[in-house]
């Protein structure tokens, strides 16, 4: 049987995709914490698409808080 593996998003090391892989998709607690720290330091962003066609009462409209929508 072929075991599916994925690359650790932090270091690229192959990680078996099994329930026994405690930190998947990361290879270790260290790589998991490095990734969490990058999110906390705002090194990663989620792109936002500005949408001028939103009605004012729609989420993200003029009265709905932040403008734009997640892409």
Curated annotation (Swiss-Prot):
Residues holding Zn(2+): 8, 11, 27, 31
Domain of life from the UniProt record: Bacteria
Coiled-coil residue windows: none
Keywords, comma-separated and alphabetical: Metal-binding, Zinc
Subunit structure: Interacts with GyrB.
Role summary: Inhibits all the catalytic activities of DNA gyrase by preventing its interaction with DNA. Acts by binding directly to the C-terminal domain of GyrB, which probably disrupts DNA binding by the gyrase.
Name the UniProt record assigns to this protein: DNA gyrase inhibitor YacG
Organism for this UniProt entry: Ralstonia nicotianae (strain ATCC BAA-1114 / GMI1000)
Gene name in the database record: yacG
């Amino acid at each position: 049987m072929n075991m599916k593996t994925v690359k650790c998003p932090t270091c690229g090391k192959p990680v078996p995709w099994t329930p026994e892989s405690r930190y998947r998709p990361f290879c270790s607690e260290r790589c998991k914490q490095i990734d969490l720290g990058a999110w906390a330091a705002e090194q990663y962003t989620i792109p936002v698409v500005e949408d001028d066609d939103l009605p004012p009462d729609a989420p993200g409209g003029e009265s709905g808080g932040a403008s734009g929508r997640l892409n």
